[in-house]
């Protein structure tokens, strides 16, 4: 609302005198308010609750374990034949191992207690309460390197001032990596983050040789992805054109780091029940890289040199990492882990009858050196040309679990909540959600078998696709490896002792009862006879 004042000048003449009077009129005018109006939410927002609110746990526990899991391959790159088919895969101690554990459907189990669940309104799910990740093979440190690493000067202990690198100053350099032990457990795949090439705002203003723009990206961690080895989590394939800035096992790959912040902020907590992490690293050597420096050091940050130092040296420094000592005193594996309270809202419930276990262990990264002779006879003198050298890396795992049988009562509120979280769960449980009534007018023909009209057959329902079929995991099938005899397995015995469960003795000592005097006949004595 605004006020407008109008001034009117009124003149009057009296006796040759001129008088002027000011008359003010006030008029009210409405105009549109410039402030924004914020509407309240249309209704109450459904809050995310813990699985303990709608999952009822039973006193039935089961053990499940995998067989001995082995992986053998080349530690730096996959080997291919002439047709491009991989003959020897890449198996490195600095890769993620993402196990996709498939569990049986508890609703198809035959339990001795027939009144355990009401099939009309209840469904069964598995709850993970214990896990043990076993690791075989001895402790060791594996090294990596590059025969053409872009290493120019030793900037830690320089022998001179290098200002004029040649056309090719690459050298053969090897190193060990950052030490990492990691374990992530959830019912959906883990997420990883890395720095990749982004899209510039003004693509026309970018010239060849400009520094690429980077952005933080998040992807699913797959089995075989490289971990952070000390050179950063980044896409080396798109951000390092020389292919000489990192060791061979990182060239043309992505190094991912677990997105702990993103998984912790996930509303339902399915991807991260819990995680264990141990990282350590120090820097061993310091170098700089040859090449034209893209970001020139500002002239106001130094005083120009003279003679051989008139040209400033390259300032692109880098270091070689090292994970230092590996010891059995700081191992995260080969010990039981009990889940009492998960980090997120999902307290260990295995929705979809599956579990994802992500493992990183660089403390057993020893590379095996193999040698084969090209001559069937033993040479009398040593000749390098008569021997072929090979590299292989081996890994050994063993997974053991303790699962608890749980019940979900599907009332309307719980069904709505689960449908919002994952609609496929209700489909697997043979529960459907009726679609809203359509307000449009639909066509219905009288004669369906009529050549005069288009075919009226309904399209066959599409088979539900695996949502993770485009990702690579190490599939572990435990559908036929469940057992209720906990004391027959190592992790089961540990759980029985931890939980205070005392199994019933199977072998009972039965004492022989003495005969009663009322029923037994007196023993007759033998008469003595004279001879």
Swiss-Prot record:
Chief location of this protein within or outside the cell: virion
Location within or outside the cell: Virion; Host nucleus
Ranges in a coiled coil: none
Compositionally biased spans, kind Low complexity: 512-523
One cellular-component annotation, GO: T=7 icosahedral viral capsid
InterPro entries: Capsid_L1_Papillomavir, Capsid_L1_sf_Papillomavir, dsDNA_vir_gr_I_capsid
Gene3D superfamilies, alphabetized: Major capsid L1 (late) superfamily, Papillomavirus
A Pfam family annotated for this UniProt entry: Late_protein_L1
Keywords annotated in UniProt: Capsid protein, Disulfide bond, Host nucleus, Host-virus interaction, Late protein, T=7 icosahedral capsid protein, Viral attachment to host cell, Viral penetration into host cytoplasm, Virion, Virus endocytosis by host, Virus entry into host cell
Chain intervals for the UniProt region annotation (Disordered): 500-531
GO molecular function: structural molecule activity
GO biological process, one term: endocytosis involved in viral entry into host cell
Family: Belongs to the papillomaviridae L1 protein family.
HAMAP family registered for this protein in UniProt: PPV_L1 (MF_04002)
Assembly: Self-assembles into homopentamers. The capsid has an icosahedral symmetry and consists of 72 capsomers, with each capsomer being a pentamer of L1. Interacts with the minor capsid protein L2; this interaction is necessary for viral genome encapsidation. Interacts with protein E2; this interaction enhances E2-dependent replication and transcription activation.
Known role: Forms an icosahedral capsid with a T=7 symmetry and a 50 nm diameter. The capsid is composed of 72 pentamers linked to each other by disulfide bonds and associated with L2 proteins. Binds to heparan sulfate proteoglycans on cell surface of basal layer keratinocytes to provide initial virion attachment. This binding mediates a conformational change in the virus capsid that facilitates efficient infection. The virion enters the host cell via endocytosis. During virus trafficking, L1 protein dissociates from the viral DNA and the genomic DNA is released to the host nucleus.
Protein name: Major capsid protein L1
Organism: Human papillomavirus 43
Lineage: Viruses, Monodnaviria, Shotokuvirae, Cossaviricota, Papovaviricetes
């Amino acid at each position: 609302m605004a006020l407008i004042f109008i001034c009117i000048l009124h003149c009057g003449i009296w006796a040759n005198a001129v008088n002027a009077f000011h008359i003010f009129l006030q008029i009210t005018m409405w105009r549109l308010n410039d402030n924004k109006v914020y509407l309240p939410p249309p209704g109450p927002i459904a809050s995310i609750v813990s699985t303990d609110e709608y999952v009822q746990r039973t006193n039935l526990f089961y053990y499940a374990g995998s067989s001995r899991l082995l992986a053998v391959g080349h530690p730096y790159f996959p080997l291919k034949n002439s047709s491009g088919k991989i003959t020897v895969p890449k198996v490195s101690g600095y890769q993620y191992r993402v196990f996709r554990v498939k569990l049986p459907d508890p609703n198809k189990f035959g339990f001795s207690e027939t009144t355990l669940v009401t099939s009309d309104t209840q469904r069964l799910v598995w709850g993970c309460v214990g896990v043990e990740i076993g690791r075989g093979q001895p402790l060791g440190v594996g090294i990596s390197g590059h025969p053409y690493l872009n290493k120019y000067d030793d900037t830690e202990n320089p022998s001179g001032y290098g200002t004029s690198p040649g056309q090719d100053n690459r050298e053969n350099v090897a190193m060990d990596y950052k030490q990492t032990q990691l374990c992530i457990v959830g019912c959906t795949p883990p997420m990883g983050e890395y720095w990749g090439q982004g899209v510039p705002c003004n693509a026309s203003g970018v010239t060849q040789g400009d520094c690429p723009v980077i952005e933080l990206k998040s992807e699913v961690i797959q089995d075989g992805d490289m971990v952070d080895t000390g050179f950063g989590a980044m896409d080396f394939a798109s951000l390092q054109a020389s292919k000489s800035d990192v060791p061979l096992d990182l060239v043309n790959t992505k190094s991912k780091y677990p997105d702990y912040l993103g998984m912790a902020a996930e509303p339902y907590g399915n991807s991260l029940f819990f995680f264990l992490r141990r990282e350590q690293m120090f820097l061993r050597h310091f170098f700089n890289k040859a090449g034209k420096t893209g970001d020139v050091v500002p002239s106001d940050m130094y005083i120009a040199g003279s003679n051989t130092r008139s040209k400033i040296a390259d300032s692109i420094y880098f270091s070689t990492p090292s994970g230092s000592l590996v010891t059995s005193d700081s191992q995260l594996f080969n010990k039981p882990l009990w889940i009492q309270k998960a980090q997120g809202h999902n307290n260990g419930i295995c929705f979809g009858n599956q579990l994802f276990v992500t493992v990183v262990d660089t403390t057993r990264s020893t590379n095996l050196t193999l040698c084969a002779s090209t001559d069937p006879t033993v040479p009398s003198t040593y000749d390098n040309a008569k021997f072929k050298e090979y590299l292989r890396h081996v890994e050994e795992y063993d997974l053991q679990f303790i699962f608890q049988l749980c019940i979900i009562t599907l009332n309307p509120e719980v069904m709505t909540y689960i449908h919002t979280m994952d609609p496929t769960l209700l489909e697997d449980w043979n529960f459907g959600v009726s679609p809203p009534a359509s307000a449009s007018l639909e066509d219905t023909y009288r004669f369906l078998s009529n050549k005069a009209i288009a075919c009226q057959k309904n399209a066959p329902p599409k088979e539900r696709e695996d949502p993770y079929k485009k990702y690579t995991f190490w599939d572990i099938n435990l559908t036929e490896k469940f057992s209720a005899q906990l004391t027959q397995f190592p992790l089961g015995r540990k759980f029985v002792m931890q939980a205070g469960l005392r199994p019933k003795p199977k072998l009972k000592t039965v004492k022989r009862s003495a005969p009663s005097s009322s029923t037994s006949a007196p023993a007759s004595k033998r008469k003595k006879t004279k001879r």
